[in-house]
Amino acid sequence: YAREKGVKIKLVAQVVKVSDRKFTMFVMPEFVTPGKYIYSVDDEYNGVVIRGECYDRQFMFGKGAGSLPTASSILSDIMARQHDYRYEYKKQHYLDRPEYTTDVELKVYVRYTETDVLKILHFDRITEQYRGEDGNYVIGYIRLSELLAKREVLRGKDVFMADFQSFFQELDR
C-alpha cells in the first residue's frame, strides 16, 4: 500500500496540545509523504519537529546515540531513581499541570487477515475499505481510547496499523 501511494512508513512519537489544559501522546507507525521533513530521515538518524509559543516550527535532525550511549543513559536514570534523585524543573511550581487525554480521533489504516478485526474495533466512520485474497484493509476514524482499550486483543491478531493523518500535519508543510 505504501509503495503504491509513494509514501514511507516511519515510527513516529507524537505529543500534541489538544486544548489549554489537555494533551495527548502516542507512538505509532505513520504514513509519511515526500513533503514532510521526516520523510528523509532514515537508518540510524532521528528527527523531531517542534513548535513553541515564541517561534514557528523547527526541525532537528541528527544521528541517534546508538545502543551503548542509550543503554548508559537508561542505566544512569535507573541509578538516579534508586537514589531518589529528581531532576529539578522550577516552572512546575508556577504552572498548572496539564491533563493527559486519549479522547482524540485518529485517522488510521488497518491491514488485517482475520475478518473479526472489524467487529473488535469500533470506528467512528470508515472512509475506505478493501477486501482481497492477499488481505484486507480499512481506512477510517477511530478514538485513541478505543485503540488502547483493544490493544491486548489485537496483539493476538495479524494486524498492522498506521496513523494515516498526523496530528502534526499542519506543522510539517
What are these model-predicted stretches?
Residues 22-24, 45-47, 55, 105-109, ...:
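Active-site lining segments that contact anionic ligands and/or coordinate catalytic metals
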Residues 13-15, 31-33, 54, 64, ...:
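A broadly conserved detector of short glycine/acidic/proline-rich loop/turn motifs that flank catalytic sites
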Residues 23-26, 31, 45, 59-61, ...:
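Phenylalanine-focused residue identity feature
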Residues 1-40, 45-47, 66:
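Substrate-binding/catalytic subdomain of NAD(P)-dependent oxidoreductase enzymes
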Residues 78-173:
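A conserved regulatory-domain signal marking ACT and ACT-like small-molecule sensing domains
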